[in-house]
Structures are given as C-alpha cells and as structure tokens.
Amino acid sequence: VAALIVALMVVKVGGELAWQSLRELIDTGLDVEDLESIRRVILSISGVKALHLLRTRRVGEQALADVHIIVDDHLSVSEGHQISEMVRAKLIREIASLADVMVHIDTEEDVNVASCAGLPLRDELQKRLDNYFRDIPEARLIEHMTLHYLNGRIDIELLLPQDAVTHSTTARQLAQRFAAAVRNDRDIGNVDVHF
C-alpha cells in the first residue's frame, strides 16, 4: 500500500513537472486580465492616444510584450522615444510577470490606413523637390524641412526666414507657389510653409 501511495505521488509530481515543462516550450500569451492591466498602464501615460497590436509571450515564469502605441503625429522623434521609454519602464515596474517590453511608436492606426512603406525617404524626395521648386527663387532660403509620413502620403513643413516674404510676395502667395509645385506628385500630401 505504501509503495502504491509513493508511486502515485511520483506520477503526480512527474505529471506536474512535465506539464510545466511543456507550457514553457509552447508559446502562450498572458491571460485576459493581464492584458487589460497592460492596456490600463499604457493608456495612463501622458502622450499615448491609443494602442494596438499588443502581443505577449510567456518565457518560463516571465513574459515578453510587444505593443504599438499611437502618439500625436507632429511629435519630435525624441519626444516619441521618451514616451515609449516611459511606457516600457512603467509596464516592467507595475506588471510583475513582464521581463521586457518592445514599444513601437506609431502616429496613426496603421492597420486601417494606407501604408507609407513605398514612399521615398528624404534623399530621394529632396531630389524631386529640388526639381519642383527650381522656379521658386525663395526655395534656396529653406532653413529646415520636416517630413510627416501619414496615411500613405508625405506632408511637408518648410521653414523659411521672415525676409523671404517681400513687398511683392505675400506669405500666402509664397505658400501657394510651393503647394502648386508639388500638386501632381501622388506621394506628397500637404505642404505647409512657416516663417
């Protein structure tokens, strides 16, 4: 009888160890309650408008998370990075099972909008703009250009010195000339000129 009891205990412990080992080998995510806790923590961070593509995976007793957060589309890269670091740190601090978190910054709900994947980067776009703006003398005065890749197009912000506006050319006329020059390029959305 004692041998039977010991044998049953060995089978029980062996089964539990086998089940735990099997769970560690199989990718499983966190349960619904943990996912809701993660969502609450993320949405409590200032600057986070929404989140999507939240994925988790258990690695032994700990878990890893991967999430896309949506921030304002005109934030600087460094501010977006700072927000992502705050999200990461707060999640690791407040969700005990999380060992690491990968936070991606998005400026729009990219699962529902046109992709920006095929749009040109700055170098290629700059060549196009040089050609488009060749008949606008004030284009040589551009001090800074900011590109916003949004909804499948590139919105452009140009910064010109105040003296680019002369008595014969108003700021509005100059802005209209820059916008008209790129009107036929399907990759370009809005052109905003600031002085």
Question: Where would I find each of the regions flagged by the language model?
Answer:
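Alpha-helical transmembrane segments and adjacent TM-loop junctions that form the membrane-embedded core
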Residues: V1-F195
